[in-house]
Amino acid sequence: MTTIVSVRRNGQVVVGGDGQVSLGNTVMKGNARKVRRLYNGKVLAGFAGGTADAFTLFELFERKLEMHQGHLLKSAVELAKDWRTDRALRKLEAMLIVADEKESLIITGIGDVVQPEADQILAIGSGGNFALSAARALVENTELSAREIVEKSLKIAGDICVYTNTHFTIEELPNS
C-alpha cells in the first residue's frame, strides 16, 4: 500500500506521501508520485490504494472541483456519493486525502468524508497509523514546521512499514 500524511500548522498545509508501488510482496516501483496538485494548484491530493483506481478518482475529483468552483467539501461529498452508488466506481480500491488552504479531508470508497481532529493531522495507507502517531507527537512537542513534521512522520512510517519507502513527494499550500 503506502503512506500519505497531511499536517496543517501555522497557516500552512502540507501533504506528503512515499513512492512505493507494490504488487503482492514485490516492489514494482519506488518513485511513484502519489501526491498531486489539482484545480490549478489550489488543492492538494494524495492517494493510498490501487494506482489506476486513484488516477480515476483524481480525474473525477478534479471534475467535481470544476463543477463546484473549487469548493472542497461539496466536491468531496459529491465524489463520495458517486463512488458509493456507481457500480463501476464502487469497485475502485483507494482512499484520498485532499486539502486546500482552508480545510483537509479524507474521502473513502464507502462514502465517508472525514474531517481531521482538532490537531488538523490526517494519515491513510498501510503506514498511516505510524505517520499519524509520529505527527501528533511532533505537533504536541516541537515547533517544527508542517513540512518538517510531514517529512519526519513519513520517514518513521518508511522505517516501520514494509509497504512504505523513503522516496517522498511533498506538496504545500501556500507555496513557500
Swiss-Prot record:
This is ATP-dependent protease subunit HslV. Belongs to the peptidase T1B family. HslV subfamily. The keyword Metal-binding applies. A double ring-shaped homohexamer of HslV is capped on each side by a ring-shaped HslU homohexamer. The assembly of the HslU/HslV complex is dependent on binding of ATP. Protease subunit of a proteasome-like degradation complex believed to be a general protein degrading machinery. It catalyses: ATP-dependent cleavage of peptide bonds with broad specificity. GO terms for biological process: proteolysis involved in protein catabolic process. It is found in: Cytoplasm. GO terms for cellular component: HslUV protease complex; proteasome core complex. GO terms for molecular function: metal ion binding; threonine-type endopeptidase activity. Allosterically activated by HslU binding. Its EC number is 3.4.25.2. It is an enzyme of class 3 (hydrolase). The active site is at T2. Na(+) binds at G158, C161, T164. PANTHER family: ATP-DEPENDENT PROTEASE SUBUNIT HSLV, METALLOPROTEASE TLDD. Keywords: Allosteric enzyme, Cytoplasm, Hydrolase, Metal-binding, Protease, Sodium, Threonine protease.
